[in-house]
Design a protein with these regions (language model features):
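Conserved RecA-like ASCE P-loop NTPase motor core of nucleic-acid helicases/translocases
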Residues: 130-134
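Conserved Walker A/P-loop ATP-binding site and its immediately adjacent core
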Residues: 135-141
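Peripheral, non-AAA+ core regions of ATP-driven protein-machinery
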Residues: 4-14, 18-91, 98-106, 111-122, ...
Length: 470
């Protein structure tokens, strides 16, 4: 049989668009510097002598494919999910690992992806068999890491392999109850001439692994590397075909890690899991609010506590603001962990509706602990931080502010206010500034240790704080 000819093409790592020549910008998605060189086999020409003519004609009504009635398919939770025993991971997964589900776990190098998955294997290996495929380490290296983490090793099977077809054959032979692939960028389909990590290899490897996971109904975790922009390296189609995409985030200079879901077909994408990186591996942080507020400076202006909702979990976070005289023709505005445009909007509201001017001041906003706040319920706390820094008037360490601020200066209601207040009371806060019209829906008896202060407008909240000499 005549071997197919090879040709060089350039493939966009973002959308998969191909081009016979290199271009700085992808003509399909418009991304810059995403066209990567790849080697593919030329497709045979269509026609009388091409593949279409050589393919046998399909007989009408003849197929080996069967369909199952929807009512006959079991959907009970105890049969369709596996609990990992790691509550933070189960929370982000939506209640455990779904049978046949494929999870793509991505993160910066050294953030702890392999550590988490090895601990996951140990957590479920008491009741389920696990197959761990490593393409980056030897089995001895994984063994040393498992010993350091004190992972149960009896029911975990290791294999160091890069050939995807060999891995699929091993999965079909052993039929494990969980498979871990570390990582997809090291996998290779031997019938493709390109090297491992290229767009075609990553795309085809992911498709073949997904096919065997669905066919055997085996849950699978796949590790994916990130590029210099923080996005998952490889074609975007890989994120589309998997069931769940998780990002493992964290500053390597800080001990804790955050697990987020960017996509989840079987649960919410708003949930968040927090872990502490220790010498014995990752440990769950069951009380993130208390951890994030540890070491909070007291009696310092520009600090206030807000409560954000991450899925069904309320988390208290410290917001810091600094307003200082500028040395530049145009004052600087900078944010860390907060939306820049939202900050400018709130500054405009404070100037127009409350009479506090920041036109000749540099303004900086920082969310302590590296948490990214996207919840508009933090608006009121951000405004109080900026005013506190402007007036050099500290906010009480026993006060929390919850509310969305509108363009008219009004303080609007927020969802899950009761849960936020209960969390604040549990941590020890004694006063809460909340939207005034939300007081009608709250029972003060439910919060015996907390005084609720209603504010209809941002000026009311600031006046209440100043009159209370905070």
């Amino acid at each position: 049989m005549k071997e197919p000819k090879l040709k060089t093409v350039y493939v966009c790592s973002n959308c998969g668009e191909t081009s016979p020549r290199w271009m700085g910008r992808c003509p399909s998605c418009g991304s810059w510097n995403t066209m990567n060189e790849d080697v593919v086999a030329e497709a045979p020409k269509a026609g009388l002598s091409g593949s279409k003519a050589a393919a046998p004609a399909r007989q009408e009504g003849v197929t080996s494919l069967t369909a199952r009635r929807l009512a006959d398919i079991s959907t009970t939770e105890e049969k369709s999910r596996i609990l990992t025993g790691i509550s933070e991971l189960d929370r982000v997964l939506g209640g455990g690992i779904v049978l046949g589900g494929v999870v793509l776990l991505s993160g910066e190098p050294g953030v702890g992806k392999s550590t988490m998955l090895l601990q996951l294997c140990g957590a479920i290996s008491n009741q389920h068999s696990v197959l761990y495929i490593t393409g980056e380490e030897s089995v001895r290296q994984v063994k040393l890491r498992a010993a350091r983490l004190k992972v149960p090793q009896e029911n975990i099977y290791l294999a160091a392999e890069n050939d995807v077809d060999e891995i699929c054959g091993l999965i079909e032979k052993e039929k494990p109850e969980l498979v871990v692939i570390d990582s997809i960028q090291t996998m290779r389909c031997m019938d493709l001439s390109s090297s491992a990590g290229t767009v075609s290899q990553v795309k085809e490897s992911a498709a073949r692994l997904l096919a065997v996971a669905k066919k055997q109904e085996i849950p699978m975790f796949i590790v994916g590397h990130v590029n210099k922009d923080g996005a998952i390296a490889g074609p975007k189609v890989m994120e589309h075909i998997v069931d769940t995409v998780h990002y493992f985030e964290g500053d390597k200079m800080l001990p804790y890690r955050i697990l987020r879901a960017a996509k989840n077909r079987y649960g919410s994408t708003n949930e968040l899991g927090m872990f502490d990186m220790t010498g014995q591996g990752l440990e769950e942080i069951e009380n993130p609010s208390q951890m994030l507020l540890e070491g909070r400076p007291l009696g310092v202006s520009g600090n206030c506590v807000a409560c954000t909702m991450e899925g069904s979990r309320p988390i208290l976070s410290e917001i810091q603001a600094l307003a200082t005289k500028t040395n530049f023709p145009a004052p600087r505005r900078a944010c860390s962990g907060y939306d820049y445009n939202r900050m400018n909007l709130l500054i405009a509201v404070l100037e127009k509706r409350a009479g506090y001017f920041f036109g000749n001041l540099d303004v900086y906003i920082n969310i302590v602990g590296g948490i990214a706040l996207r919840d508009t319920a933090c608006d009121l706390a951000v405004c109080l931080c900026m005013v506190s820094s402007l007036l050099d008037c500290p906010v009480s360490d026993k006060l929390i502010a919850i509310g969305e601020v509108g363009l008219g200066g009004e303080v609007r209601s927020v969802p899950n206010l009761e849960q936020r207040l209960r969390e604040a009371e549990r941590i020890g806060f004694e006063r809460a500034v909340v939207p005034k019209h939300s007081l009608a829906h709250l029972n003060p008896a439910d919060y015996p240790g907390m005084k609720l202060i209603g504010a209809a407008y941002i000026s009311d909240a600031i006046h209440a704080l100043k009159s209370d000499r905070l």
